[in-house]
């Protein structure tokens, strides 16, 4: 995933 998507997962 991209850096932006990681914020949503974690």
Curated annotation (Swiss-Prot):
Keywords: Antimicrobial, Fungicide. One of its GO terms (biological process) is defense response to fungus. It comes from the Eukaryota. Exerts antifungal activity against F.oxysporum and M.arachidicola, with an IC(50) of 2 uM for the former fungus and 10 uM, respectively. Has weak mitogenic activity against murine splenocytes. Displays antiproliferative activity on a human hepatoma cell line and mouse leukemia cell lines. Inhibits human immunodeficiency virus-1 (HIV-1) reverse transcriptase. This is Gymnin. It comes from Gymnocladus chinensis.
